[in-house]
């Protein structure tokens, strides 16, 4: 069962799902908001004996994102999802659930899925 958890402290369903999970995948953006959230929550959702995997998701096409710094601070990054102009366009058009035609992005997602399974 996959549960998309929120970052809100008062979200009981997310807290319960994270506490009950055998494996946790955390997707973080390499920006101030993502790193601040990680720093304040890094011990709260992980229980002993659970696997925790970090994935860094680049959502903006900015030149100076601190991607390397964020990856080194996370210690267990299994993958880096590259920026996708096509996916950004789909998000802005409200058709995010449509299949994207960005071949490089799709290939990277398939690689991540292979690591997970």
Regions found by a protein language model. Give the residues of each.
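Generic hydrophobic alpha-helical segments
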Residues: 38-42, 105-112, 116
């Amino acid at each position: 069962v996959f549960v998309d958890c929120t970052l809100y402290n008062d979200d009981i369903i997310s807290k319960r799902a994270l506490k009950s999970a055998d494996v946790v995948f955390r997707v973080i953006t390499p920006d101030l908001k993502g790193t601040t959230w990680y720093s304040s929550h890094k011990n709260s959702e992980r229980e002993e004996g659970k696997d925790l995997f970090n994935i860094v998701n680049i959502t903006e096409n900015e030149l100076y994102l601190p991607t390397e710094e964020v990856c080194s601070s996370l210690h267990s990054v299994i993958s880096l999802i590259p920026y996708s102009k096509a996916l950004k366009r789909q998000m802005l058009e409200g058709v995010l659930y449509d299949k994207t035609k960005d071949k490089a992005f799709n290939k990277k997602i398939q690689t991540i899925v292979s690591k997970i399974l």
